[in-house]
Swiss-Prot record:
Phosphate binds at residues 30, 73-74, 106-107, 216. It catalyses: S-methyl-5'-thioadenosine + phosphate = 5-(methylsulfanyl)-alpha-D-ribose 1-phosphate + adenine. Keywords: Cytoplasm, Glycosyltransferase, Nucleus, Purine salvage, Transferase. It is an enzyme of class 2 (transferase). Pathway: Amino-acid biosynthesis; L-methionine biosynthesis via salvage pathway; S-methyl-5-thio-alpha-D-ribose 1-phosphate from S-methyl-5'-thioadenosine (phosphorylase route): step 1/1. This is S-methyl-5'-thioadenosine phosphorylase. One of its GO terms (cellular component) is nucleus. It comes from the Eukaryota. It is found in: Cytoplasm; Nucleus. Belongs to the PNP/MTAP phosphorylase family. MTAP subfamily. One of its GO terms (molecular function) is S-methyl-5-thioadenosine phosphorylase activity. The gene is MEU1. It comes from Yarrowia lipolytica (strain CLIB 122 / E 150) (Yeast).
């Protein structure tokens, strides 16, 4: 489903390499494979120790020449289930091209009446309801490390996104929901999928003060933290999940219809964010505070560290250990 114009061209028409660091990455979810306001200049095929990413990395430039790396989370043809998304390869590939900040788009179900279908949400917290079958760390047996996850989304990046994305809804009947407007954290529940929630599950998540639910935030956000990349998700509401007693449970047809409508809003959000993100990355007010944080995260004694895992981690953080 290619709802937004002018990002992904055919590999034959684009360069296969790009020499400059690309500090901004955008991960697109369902219905968001292409972005407006950008000119594609390269499409890079990257191999990582964790395999290939979901799609080639497409590098596009703004009119000022600012480069942006785009990755299709579920594959160009949407052939990867949420469980099968190679998140470690995705984050590692973005890290390899120089990304310091990621803005990730995702379709979500709403768990609250005030978050209507086609509204957007900038979440601040996560409840992990995945099943532990997705690799959620670059660290493995023989090379143990721990990362703080009290703030699953980057606070500075989240504030920038919330402030500037709001402008895209100035003349819209839809809204963007932020912590500043709500006066409280907006919690994203991440479930395994690919089936949607039962009504009982959906009501349970509401009782936990969940705001929205998706299948993508975990392990993407955890891996970005380990990669020392600032990460913020922007959620696009497609439905009321299954909690509303007076409505039929969500259907795929309903989701796809709202995905199409959300694409136009997403284009406006991206256009509103590009200039402030370029400025913030240039002056290092976002994307750099995590630098070096993983150097001291390892618990395993040097003599006991697994050589293969160490080599893999060197791809991510050269010279750290």
């Amino acid at each position: 489903m290619a709802f937004l114009p002018n990002l992904v061209a055919t590999p034959m028409s684009l360069a296969s390499s790009y020499s400059k660091p690309v500090t901004l990455g955008i991960i697109g979810g369902t219905g968001l494979y292409k972005l407006g306001a950008l000119t594609p200049v390269a499409q890079i095929d990257i191999d990582t120790p964790w395999g290939k990413p979901s799609s080639p990395i497409t590098i596009s430039e703004t009119k000022s020449g600012f480069p942006v790396a785009f990755l299709a989370r579920h594959g160009v043809n949407h052939d990867l289930t949420p469980t099968d998304v190679p998140s470690r390869a995705n984050i590692a590939a973005l890290k390899k091209v120089g990304v310091k900040a990621i803005v990730a788009f995702s379709a979500v179900g709403s768990l609250q009446e005030e978050i209507a279908p086609r509204d957007f949400v900038v979440p601040t917290q996560i409840i992990d309801r995945t099943k532990g079958i997705r690799p959620s760390s670059f660290f493995e047996k023989g090379f143990v490390g721990h990362v703080g996850f009290g703030e699953p989304f980057d606070v500075a990046l989240g504030k920038l996104v919330a402030e500037h994305a709001d402008k895209a809804f100035d003349n819209s009947k839809y809204k963007i929901h932020t912590k500043a407007k709500a006066g409280k954290d907006l919690t994203l529940v991440c479930m395994e999928g690919p089936a949607f929630s039962t009504r009982a599950e959906s009501q349970l998540y509401r009782s936990w003060n969940g705001a929205v639910i998706n299948m993508s935030a975990i392990p993407e956000s955890k891996l970005a933290k380990e990669a020392e990349i600032a990460y913020q998700m922007i959620c696009m509401s497609t439905d009321y999940d299954a909690w509303k007693e007076d409505e039929e449970p969500v259907t795929v047809e309903q989701v796809v219809s709202n995905l199409t409508a959300n694409a136009e809003s997403a284009t406006g959000v991206v256009e509103a964010l590009l200039e402030p993100l370029e400025k913030a990355l240039a002056d290092k007010s976002i994307g750099y505070d995590l630098d070096g944080s993983m150097k001291f995260a390892v618990s395993t004694a040097p003599a006991a560290r697994d050589a293969t895992v160490a080599k893999n981690l060197d791809f991510l953080h050269p010279g750290y250990w």
